[in-house]
Every structure is written in C-alpha cells, then in structure tokens.
Amino acid sequence: MTIDRNQGNFEAEEPPPTIKEVEQAVKKLKNNKAPGLDLSTAELVKFGGPEYARHLHQLIVKIWITEIITEEWNQSIVCPIHKRGNVMICSNYRGISLLCIAYKIFSNILFNRLSPFVEGIIGDYQCEFRQGRSTNDQIFAIRQVLEKCNEFQIETHHLFIDFRSAYDSIDRDNLFLAMEKMHIPRKLMALARAAKRKTQCQIKIKDMLSSPIITRNGVRQGDSLACLLFNLALEKVIRDAGINTRGTIFYTSQFKFWHLQMILI
C-alpha cells in the first residue's frame, strides 16, 4: 500500500504500535546473526514468547509517546568487512553495524509505518529497496531502451555512478528537513530523528572494542530504516537538481541511467 502525499491529513498523530505489530517484528528477525552491545540474539527474543513481547510493547509505546529513545539503542558495534584490494587500506572495508535487538524490533515497526508514505513520495525512477522491483526488471528495461534506441538511431548515454560511502555521507539535518518538506507525518519524522540522535559506535577487531565514537552523519548499515532514509535523501538530490526524470531508470546506490539530454552532474 502507498499513501499519496497530496491526500490525507499529514498532521494527524500516528497511533502507537499494537502488540501484534511487535510480535510480527519479532517473527521477522533473522536467526544466526551476531548480537549488539546487549548480547541478545533473535533466537533468545523469540524464545521469550508473548511475555517478552508484552514488556517490549510497553517500552515501545512509551518511546512512541515521549519520542525519546533509550541511550543503549543509539549505540552499535561496527565490524569492518573486507571488500577488495589491500587489507591495510581502510577504504577497502565496509562496516556492518551490530544493533541492539530491541532497537531492531522498533526500527522494523517504524519502517513498516514509514514505507507507505515513502512509496507515495519517491518517483518511479527509483528502484532500490522497493518491493516488486527486481534487478531482472531493470536489466530488461535497459535492454529495451538500448534495442529501441539502436533501432531508431537515437543517441543514448549510460552513466554509472558508484557512491563512495553512500550511507555514511548523508547529512542528517538536511535529510530531516527534506522529510518535513515531503510531508512525512510529524510523529514518524520525530521518531526517525530520535533514532539518529547522539548515535555512537565502537569498532570491533577480533575480540577488541574501540572507545565509543560519536557519529553525526549518515545512516547505519544493518538498520531497517537506512534504506528508506537513503531513498528519501536521493529523492531530495534529484528534485534539487531539477532533473527531468522522464524515461529515466535509477537502480541501487551504484547505478543510474539517463538519456543524453537528462545527464546533469
């Protein structure tokens, strides 16, 4: 389901999550994942059953009302994963954030509440992290563009962009300003802001943890909200650039395709 940003009362309060939403978020947790600073795993939470869900629901409702997230939820462990090249060069690694299990549940609930609004805001040219828009669909679409342009001798240009540290480079203040201009409900925006306020991380190398590092920009890898917030940030860039998106395909944070007259860097 999507919600048209031009319809409805976007100042209306979003009601707190139900116990059913909490239970569904618990069920969606993936097993065999490393724990965060709370040392709690998905298997342990699921074993807690209805009693755990009831207590967590009470906490989430309190957070929903006060818009204040417990400090522990804003802390994470970052594990560097080697991607390629020289192992001594930091840029050849990507970081995966290990988050507290209770925050993962809260984040998943907030993701489900935000998704219909985001789907009604971002354009059809964005395909990353969107249900029903597979890689195969985009490959098929670009092949059709190539074949038709070749058939009718239309000049076509392809632009491949690799965003370096895409998640880490997002300016949070600008992101939330964009969310406000795009009429994201105030409650959901406030909770998303709370989830990104005063975030800290500790780098884990083998069994050693660094001192806490305050992070002021970016969204966290491994956070359910990260993909939605990244798509909103990219939507703001597209709108601010004044790009005519007709006939354009955007797919993943690495690739974009434009016709010649639509290229703007």
Regions found by a protein language model. Name each.
Residues 40-48, 126-133, 160-166, 263:
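Conserved short loop/turn motifs at secondary-structure junctions
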Residues 163-261:
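Conserved polymerase palm-domain catalytic core
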Residues 133-139, 228:
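Amphipathic alpha-helical oligomerization segments
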Residues 64-66, 143-147, 246, 251-253:
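Eukaryotic intrinsically disordered and solvent-exposed regulatory patches
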Residues 1-91, 97, 101, 105:
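Surface-exposed loop/turn segments and immediately adjacent short secondary-structure elements
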Residues 32-40, 78, 88-98, 137-180, ...:
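Conserved catalytic palm subdomain of right-hand nucleotidyl-transferase polymerases, strongest
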Residues 1, 32-35, 54, 66-72, ...:
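Short helix-interrupting loop/turn segments at helix-coil junctions
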